[in-house]
Amino acid sequence: MHRRNLLKASMAIAAYTGLSATGLLASRAWAASGGAADGEAQAFDFETLKRQAKQLAGSAYQDTKQVLPPTLATMTPQNFNAIRYDGEHSLWKENKGQLDVQFFHVGMGFRQPVRMYSVDPKTRTAREVHFRPQLFNYENTSVDTQQLKGDLGFAGFKLFKAPELDRHDVVSFLGASYFRAVDATGQYGLSARGLAVDTYAKKREEFPDFTKFWFETPDQNATRFVVYALLDSPSATGAYRFDIDCQAERVVMEVDAHINARTAIEQLGIAPMTSMFSCGTHERRMCDTIHPQIHDSDRLAMWRGNGEWICRPLNNPATLQFNAFADTDPKGFGLVQTDHEFANYQDTVDWYSKRPSLWVEPTTAWGEGSIDLLEIPTTGETLDNIVAFWTPKKPVAAGDSLNYGYKLYWSALPPVGTPLARVHATRSGMGGFVEGWAPGEHYPPVWARRFAVDFTGGGLDRLPQGTGIEPVVTCSNGKVQDFSVLVLDDIKGYRILFDWYPTNDSVEPVELRLFIRTNDRTLSETWLYQYFPPAPDKRKYP
């Protein structure tokens, strides 16, 4: 997949922040006289952009990716990271306000020249910011600036908010239509995209590009960014409006996406997000490291249109897996990092304990469709292998125009949660021993797989003494038995234990489903899990 190369390049700049540099080559006098936007004024508003995107969809796709000069095309990630934007040329430096914008240099695999515009909201006019080497500092790089001829454009941008102006960015748009944001920890994690096309289809996946951005100049005391974007690809175009609120504990983006299909699209992904899951409490296949867990996200959380809450722990499967969860007008979904305890990761480099979650909240009626989940095998943490998005049920035909409104919440945990008990953790290991522990003198006579699902919250700690807790478990193949319900005082909840036994030689994934209830009252969200049985000759103990 091209996904691997693109995401690997993105990972290389994960630590790249807009740190101010000294000894810059750029001219301070030039910045004071004109600012970064140096183009001619032209009329602009969102309605005009929507018309432009619609008209563009009616014409043949033009690939505008450029051939970069050798000094940029062959550069290493370290060299790319060493290029610094000159903070004195930040887009709104002269405003002396609460917000600012800086730009990423083109280089490595970032060959799409992205055009940037500054918008005056009072006159509704826009002026382009043209690339020129004077905007950047190349002091600690091997870049030959003599090769930087003409307007190369930019690769993307990053947003800053006081009091960290010119120090630590809070939002980053870089590569294709990828973008990310931080929460209170200041740590980047998973990514979102403007659009996904044919992620799991019979043809090769397509990665649309944001090719132009417009930044609405804020008032001096404003604390919200308004950014417009034009998206282009062989199959679709789009006009986007992002209202970005960088709050103290989270970043909230309100997205208005108008999408136009150039061609029929087999699989259209709305509000796509990309993450990484290598290993966790239940999946240890690729965890032979010093770290107990390695992941940006540990679960897909879904709040269905009918009100049901679902927790689907993520996997790092041996083979690619795709699952579609049908729904109508979903209330929300997201890839969530629920565990933020350092001890459970022991990571002082990538800080997985600080990674944010990403939650999607539809603000328009999305109708029928499915929340799709793609899990790709990965051998390490530098390759993102988890993708989730919404796919409309109605086929997308050439000439179709669609509008989706939604909010994106980048925060430690989603802004909403089930009032019922929620899944705290999932664990899996050797089963078949009814003693409740692994006997030291013998192995169980029959092979089985044990699962432990912990539930917490939802008033479980306030249930009357003697309340009967009933686990309701179903499986798509095999059988489940040997149930135990244990009180966990540490989390003020319960642990449900059960064993799965095969009843045939199938190695197809087994879909497990569990919730707990008392009498006829549901007590928890629904746990969904996909288990991959070993081959029949592996279903034995030593």
Curated annotation (Swiss-Prot):
According to its UniProt record, where is this protein located? Periplasm
- Cite the annotated pathway: Glycan metabolism; osmoregulated periplasmic glucan (OPG) biosynthesis
The record's comment on protein family reads: Belongs to the OpgD/OpgG family.
Question: Which residues, if any, are the signal sequence?
Answer: 1-31
Which gene holds the coding sequence for this protein?
opgD
Q: What name does this protein carry?
A: Glucans biosynthesis protein D
Which species is this UniProt entry from? Pseudomonas fluorescens (strain Pf0-1)
Q: Name one GO cellular component term.
A: outer membrane-bounded periplasmic space
**Molecular function GO labels:** carbohydrate binding; catalytic activity
